[in-house]
Amino acid sequence: MALNDFHVSEPYTLGIELEMQVINPPGYDLSQDSSTLIDAVKPQLTAGEIKHDITESMLEMATGVCRDIDQAAAQLSAMQHVILQAASEHHLGICGGGTHPFQKWQRQEVCDNERYQRTLENFGYLIQQATVFGQHVHVGCANGDDAIYLLHGLSHFVPHFIALSAASPHMQGSDTRFACARLNIFSAFPDNGPMPWVSNWQEFAGLFRRLSYTTMIDSIKDLHWDIRPNPAFGTVEVRVMDTPLTLDHAINMAGLIQATAHWLLTERPFKPQEQDYLLYKFNRFQACRYGLEGVITDAYTGDRRRLADDTLRLLDNVTPSARKLGADSAIDALRLQVKKGGNEAQYMREFIADGGSLIGLVQKHCEIWAGQ
């Protein structure tokens, strides 16, 4: 299968996707009513898109192409408002978080959609288990070679993005001991983790052609890499973040990725090499398991650094770019988060430690998303 030509995009423009949980009070399990909610909301949209994801308990909010995080925030806020209004009318709740803490995958209904039904046929129960919720951020690129460079540059900071956004400590009714358990769900997929090494767009086109020989890959959407190029949109898409509990945190994460992309493409601080990925999965695991307390290891020097410390260094490096893009408020908020030493997974554990239940936790998440 031939790959689409890389669509030229305005560099550093943004697109944000948020996979939301559709909740059924008063038990606060996942609902199977996303189709009802989507049908009610679509006629009211003035910008962005609300659509299905894999199962009927998932709802995706997606912005259009945005100049900056303020425009993205305005679109997401408008969508949030109409979704919450429709959810209230249908006696449903909406919340963030990377996993639902006690849902059972066996109960999840795959959407009546040709692509998702084909994926169910290919992957079986793995698709139902993938009822997890992430934030994806697209950044515009001028050409395919820039996209490949940006993908490799952003891959250095996958642990940082995971640790900052980690919001999935519970799964199937248990504390997993992970800050981000969501990404473990994808470990059985054949395309899990980093993209196979290529050095330019021409090599990527060849890689895609060979992957399509498997008959399991019909489009870029069928590849579940942590970061992937999207030629139809002219973007690089970062896919490792848990869906945050608040819209503010989602915007902050998008601002960080936009600023990091600007820094990488203007400063070119790395010369990408295949060896960069030697310890990729080890460092990724540290972020998933321990969050900001994880320790990452340099593949070349063997130096070991706390993720919290290295994240502060990243935030300092991208601050000038953030100012140029109007994303400095996002960097300031994330810097404060790191200095306080927490993420949303830590908050969830503290809620339970203080005597809360998993049902009460989901109820609280719905209240947080609704601004209560």
UniProtKB/Swiss-Prot annotation:
Protein's UniProt keywords contain Ligase: yes
Keyword terms, alphabetized: ATP-binding, Ligase, Nucleotide-binding
Alphabetized GO MF terms: ATP binding; glutamate-cysteine ligase activity
GO biological process, alphabetically ordered: modified amino acid biosynthetic process
InterPro entries from the UniProt entry: GCL_type2/YbdK_subfam (IPR050141), GCS2 (IPR006336), Gln_synth/guanido_kin_cat_dom (IPR014746), YbdK (IPR011793)
Domain of life of the source: Bacteria
Reaction(s) the record says it catalyses: L-cysteine + L-glutamate + ATP = gamma-L-glutamyl-L-cysteine + ADP + phosphate + H(+)
EC number: 6.3.2.2
Coiled coil regions in record: none
Cysteines joined through disulfide linkages: none
Short name of any one Pfam family annotated for the protein: GCS2
Alphabetized HAMAP family for the sequence: Glu_cys_ligase_2 (MF_01609)
Functional note: ATP-dependent carboxylate-amine ligase which exhibits weak glutamate--cysteine ligase activity.
Assembly, per entry: Homodimer.
Family as reported in the entry's similarity comment: Belongs to the glutamate--cysteine ligase type 2 family. YbdK subfamily.
Name this polypeptide is given: Putative glutamate--cysteine ligase 2
